Every structure is written in structure tokens, then in C-alpha cells.
């Protein structure tokens, strides 16, 4: 069984999931680990606020500068790569994507990931096979319901960083 929290801040008590706010650092691993949406972070706005701020900082960094963006969609792991521990990749390597528009680029990468089947024995495959699983038709949400990637791209598009519309051109 996978460890639910690296800081032991989430645990079961009286058959209910509990988060010890004193130990919690807000990484969201417990939320991603829970297949049944039984754990909710008290600061439920934090992820949405972070996503909006990332879009705003991106706009500031790119303002008045030319940009060409490259994403390598490989080793797609369940949690952010900033987490000190993680699980095996949950989707096959997809490839390299590039664009002058960072929003279109990220949207294309998300769509490509969602078209893939989860790798067998991955955290995502385990989540989706669990009894009572609620399919959100989005692998990122299925893996970590508390993490909503859409808010970042929606806000980035709204403030003029780019557009979520794209045309995929394969280069071999």
C-alpha cells in the first residue's frame, strides 16, 4: 500500500479521513491518493489562486518578449515533480510539443494526455479500478481531484497570455 502522507498529517480515525492541520504542508498528496473525495483541504481556494497567479506571472515574464515554448510530455507522474516522493509514471511517454503560444501548448498537452490509457499498475489505473470510483473523464482530475488545471489555462486565456485553441501539426 502506498503511503498517503509523507509527513503523516493525514490518517484514518473512526473510519473517516482526517488531516492534522499542524503537520500539513498543503501538498495535496492525500487528496490525490483518496479515490472517493473523502478528504478536502480546508484551504480549498489555494489551488485555484495558485493557478491564477501562475498565469499572471507568466504574462509578466512574457510581456514584450518573443517566446517559443517546448513541453516534453514524458514520465508523467501522479504528483507535481516538486514533491519529495512520487509514484511511477501513470501514462506512456507521449512526446515533444512546441508552440509560440504557451496556453495552446499546455491545452494540447493536456488533451494528448487525456487521450492515453493509464499504464497498468499505476496510481491512476488503481484509482480508476477502485470500487466506487467517480470518473471525471479527465486523467488529471481522476488522479488528483483537488487539482484543477483548467483554472490556470482559463485565466491565462482571459488575461491575454494566449488561446486554448490549437492546431496540432505532427513533425516526424
Predicted regions and their residues:
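Extended, low-polarity segments enriched in aliphatic/aromatic residues
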Residues: 3, 7-172
Amino acid at each position: 500500500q502506498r503511503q498517503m502522507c509523507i509527513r503523516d498529517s493525514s490518517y484514518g480515525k473512526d473510519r473517516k479521513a482526517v488531516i492534522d492541520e499542524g503537520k500539513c504542508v498543503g501538498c495535496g498528496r492525500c487528496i490525490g491518493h483518496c479515490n472517493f473525495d473523502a478528504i478536502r483541504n480546508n484551504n480549498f481556494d489555494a489551488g485555484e489562486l495558485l493557478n491564477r497567479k501562475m498565469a499572471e506571472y507568466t504574462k509578466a515574464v512574457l510581456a514584450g518578449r518573443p517566446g517559443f515554448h517546448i513541453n516534453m510530455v514524458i514520465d508523467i507522474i501522479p504528483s507535481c515533480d516538486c514533491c519529495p516522493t512520487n509514484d511511477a509514471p501513470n501514462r506512456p511517454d507521449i512526446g515533444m510539443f512546441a508552440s509560440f503560444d504557451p496556453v495552446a501548448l499546455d491545452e494540447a498537452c493536456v488533451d494528448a494526455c487525456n487521450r492515453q490509457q493509464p499504464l497498468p499498475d499505476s496510481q491512476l489505473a488503481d484509482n480508476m479500478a477502485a470500487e466506487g470510483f467517480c470518473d471525471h473523464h479527465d486523467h488529471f482530475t481522476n488522479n488528483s481531484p483537488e487539482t484543477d488545471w483548467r483554472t490556470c489555462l482559463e485565466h491565462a486565456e482571459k488575461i491575454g497570455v494566449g488561446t486554448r485553441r490549437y492546431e496540432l501539426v505532427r513533425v516526424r
